[in-house]
């Protein structure tokens, strides 16, 4: 194998593709989605109600749970790797200890990379064909770029850092599943006020901590090291490293774009005023 193609030769063998984790993620998302749709329809929930983009409300709620529940999987395995729980000690053993960029972890590939790859493919399909509210360029870009990053890691590239970028950061999406529901079902927050407020607090806190504070603290040194690899000609594949840098920059931009909106939401919850209202008040003082 020539070094310059090593980063793209991922060996997508039947053993990898047909792992139980990969099959599980492939099956669980549509099963949850259509199972919940059937359940809601049987109970007559949200009959005839649609979003402003024309998506049936029950489809939106089914989507939120079908894609929110798998985030518990990613979060759990990220925590296990971080803390070394349940024999998930790959971060503290070879080969990841001595090679954080090209050491391969079967645990990471099985439990994070393959499932996330499938998750993002499904997310792209649902966004394009089923959920009109998600037909936005930034959503397509996020799903496709994230799936591509998983693909690059299948043969041992950046497996070490997956515990954070694929695992821990998904904690915020677990809370987001509940936070998003009142956008389509306004009465939810009134019927379940404690659950909604707790989820809001958990989402805002985890997003700011994980995606706006810790993300750049980890991403910046990674990008620096990858640039040094390109400079020193030690990258296995210059094209892969370059593409990964661009993908990371794009995803980082999205974290801060969304993070600013979330920080505004947090400010309004705490103060009861939007940032614009606070600025107007200060000007009047």
Give the location of each predicted region.
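Alpha-helical transmembrane segments and their membrane-interface exit regions
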Residues: 168-179
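Membrane-helix and juxtamembrane interface regions of eukaryotic multi-pass membrane proteins
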Residues: 1-168, 182-285
């Amino acid at each position: 194998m020539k070094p310059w193609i090593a980063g793209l030769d991922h060996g997508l063998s039947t053993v990898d593709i047909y792992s139980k984790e990969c099959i599980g993620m492939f099956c669980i998302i549509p099963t949850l989605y259509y199972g919940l749709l059937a359940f809601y329809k049987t109970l007559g929930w949200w009959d005839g109600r649609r979003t402003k983009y024309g998506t049936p409300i029950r489809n939106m709620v089914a989507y939120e749970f079908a894609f929110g529940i798998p985030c518990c999987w990613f979060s759990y395995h990220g925590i296990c790797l971080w803390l070394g729980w349940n024999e998930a000690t790959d971060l503290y053993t070879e080969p990841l200890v001595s090679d954080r960029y090209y050491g391969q972890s079967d645990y990471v590939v099985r439990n994070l990379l393959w499932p996330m790859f499938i998750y993002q493919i499904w997310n792209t399909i649902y966004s394009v064909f089923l959920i009109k509210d998600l037909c936005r360029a930034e959503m397509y870009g996020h799903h496709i770029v994230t799936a591509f990053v998983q693909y690059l890691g299948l043969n041992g590239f950046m497996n070490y850092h997956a515990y954070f970028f694929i695992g821990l950061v998904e904690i915020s999406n677990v809370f987001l599943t509940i936070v998003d529901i009142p956008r389509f079902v306004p009465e939810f927050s009134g019927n379940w006020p404690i659950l909604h407020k707790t989820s809001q607090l958990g989402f805002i806190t985890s997003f700011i901590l994980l995606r706006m504070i810790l993300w750049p603290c980890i991403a910046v040194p990674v990008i620096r090291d990858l640039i040094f690899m390109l400079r020193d000609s030690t990258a296995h594949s210059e094209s892969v490293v370059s593409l990964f840098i661009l993908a990371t920059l794009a995803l980082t931009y999205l974290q801060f774009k969304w993070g600013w909106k979330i920080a505004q939401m947090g400010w309004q919850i705490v103060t009861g005023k939007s940032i614009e209202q606070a600025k107007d008040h200060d000007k009047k003082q």
